[in-house]
Amino acid sequence: MYFQSFYFLALLLATAVYGQVASPELHSLSRRNWKKPPPFPSTNASYAPVIRSCDSSEIMVNSLPRGELPDLENDFIEKRLSNANEALTTFLQSKNTTADLDLSSIVGDNGPRLGIAVSGGGWRSMLFGGGALAALDSRSNETTLGGLLQSAHYITGADGGSWLLSSLAVNEFRTIQNISKSIWYTRLGIFFIEETHFGDLKNYYTNVVDEVNQKAAAGFNVSLTDYWGRAIARHFVGQLRGGPNLTYSSVQNASWFQTAEYPYPLIVTQGLTGGLPDGSNGTATNSSIYEISPYYLTSFDNNVRSYTPTQYLGTNYSNGTAVDGKCVTQFDNVGFLVGTSSTRYNEALIDVSLRQSRMSRRLGFTLRHMRINGSSVSFYPNPYTDATDIAGNATAVSEDIVDTPYLDLFDGGYDGQNIPIWPLLQPERKLDVVFAFDSSGDTSNFWPNGSSLVATYERVTQRASDAVYDVEDFVHVPTPETFVNLGLNANPTFFGCDGRNTTRGDVPVDHNTPPLVVYMPNTPWTMKSNLVDHRYRIANSEIQALIQNGFVATTQDNSTDFASCLACAVVQRSLERRNQSTSAACQQCFSQYCWNGTVDNTPVDDDSKNPTYNPAVKTSSASGVHANILLSFFVLLATLLVTA
């Protein structure tokens, strides 16, 4: 134990040897070869990115003209349309509110298009979101909402939401029931070594540090995010030691991705240019928002409005071409990317390490030193360096970005937009409805209060004259006080049911009209599901109970009436674009679930010892698993025993 402790400390404090990994092979970067996916991870599981020779004349950074999508994303969505339309038609035919519609004219290339956004919130979000996706999955038993996952075109995730979507993406989009029992594992916590842990045996700390040192030794700057990413990946990837060489771009090889069988996955993060604000990891609401797919790192914001292949992240570019003909692969490690989207846990990682064993306390002191030296964000070699005029075409990349060597990327929810809905508002994606699953810990006892939607609303309505984004409109939403006082955060709520009553004004509905938002908050249907943000150990039985709570909350205890009303929300924009009236049945649904504009801004006392908002468990039983309060009690007792 003591030998291991000193060895681990020595590893952390050792000076990294910086070098360059050379490869004699010529790695073609032509646009044709972008379509050739990177290989699956090999058994040589090194975390170090690989430097290869490549053609320095190839353009690898492309501007994104307004009205267009990145080329391979567009190809994916074109392929996705037929799969999604077939699933959506089946869903709508089964609901009494939409079965009588002429679905052949409503469902098609012109819509409806669906998006899913899973909020941040650590394990709380991953497990509630997992239950929600299970509820939307046609492969799940006893769900009234089955088929909506198969109908969706996009899925976004930030923080814990990115853990969820990445876990699905790298594991062939297996069912939540399967993946939660075979891969998700939290009982030992994230930085603990009491038992055998995913092939680490008793060398957990040593392995994590060795892996990060491999990256440093290859000549790349490392940060707290590298350690955090290596730790969290062990809990959702399903590969030995969390897949040290598993890349996000390798998802292109997955059969589900090649056939576009499930939604296009986007990890959402934010960029800070010009360094961190003094004493803060936050950002202004007009900072750049980046999204990472298996194909591209993209930003639609006007100060970037460009995209570059995910496969070659880490490459040093100058004006869109690789410097000295050297390209980097394997920088886009899945753990590193989702760690980037959840960097707020970097600070918690330090705190946990300082509170644990003597060995982990030493880890904490070392990581805290990294924080003091400015390594609390994630370092991405800037692909937009000097990218002012690529191939004779002027770019939109701003001077403060082209002049910096690194993109400082960090948590996708730091500006308050904890529901990663922004990428789904881009007019180019033509989405009609967004399911927004909110597991934010807004209140003192970690329940959502709508603040995430309010932050997006303010980003749009308080748009400065020099705003860096094109999204100009959003649905109207009330204050967090109204969310709580009217119970909008305790039940599903539809926002923007009338497409002519958004921030865009009373104008005809078209694809520039913001999508209707179906707000689905984390609520205690079968158990108290308000896990604290920095809880790291969860019993396997509690994982299943939390997933079941998300399932029941999403289906409203398998309510057929709610499922029929959700069908109304899905087709609403398509009907409005055609000037078709809403049916009487759907009007009744909207009167029940749509926010009608009522406000109640009475201050909400958020005393953590006696909070005003402290919802009770709604039901003692649920369809499918028949979870009950007694089970929750035993799960809690078991968790306390494990964590004692």
Swiss-Prot record:
Q: What is its main location?
A: secreted
Q: Coiled-coil annotation: which residues? A: none
Per the UniProt entry, what is one GO biological process? glycerophospholipid catabolic process
**Where found, per UniProt?**
Secreted
Cellular-component GO terms for this entry: cytosol; endoplasmic reticulum; external side of plasma membrane; extracellular region; fungal-type cell wall
Q: Which reaction does it catalyse?
A: a 1-acyl-sn-glycero-3-phosphocholine + H2O = sn-glycerol 3-phosphocholine + a fatty acid + H(+)
Supply the InterPro entries for this chain: Acyl_Trfase/lysoPLipase (IPR016035), LysoPLipase_cat_dom (IPR002642)
Signal peptide position in this chain?
A: 1-19
Matching entries from PROSITE patterns are given as: PLA2C (PS51210)
- Where the record annotates domain PLA2c, the positions are 53-600
What does the record give as EC number? 3.1.1.5
Q: Which GO terms describe its molecular function?
A: lysophospholipase activity; phospholipase A2 activity
Q: Which SUPFAM superfamilies match?
A: FabD/lysophospholipase-like
Residues modified by carbohydrate are 44, 96, 141, 178, 221, 245, 253, 281, 286, 316, 319, 373, 393, 449, 501, 558, 579, 596
| Listed SMART domains | PLAc
Q: Print the keywords alphabetically.
A: Glycoprotein, Hydrolase, Lipid degradation, Lipid metabolism, Secreted, Signal
Q: Name one Pfam family in it.
A: PLA2_B
Q: Which PANTHER family does the annotation name?
A: CYTOSOLIC PHOSPHOLIPASE A2 (PTHR10728), LYSOPHOSPHOLIPASE C1786.02-RELATED (PTHR10728:SF60)
Say what the protein does.
Answer: Catalyzes the release of fatty acids from lysophospholipids.
Q: Which family does the record claim for this protein? A: Belongs to the lysophospholipase family.
- Protein name per Swiss-Prot or TrEMBL: Probable lysophospholipase 2
Give the source species.
Answer: Schizosaccharomyces pombe (strain 972 / ATCC 24843) (Fission yeast)
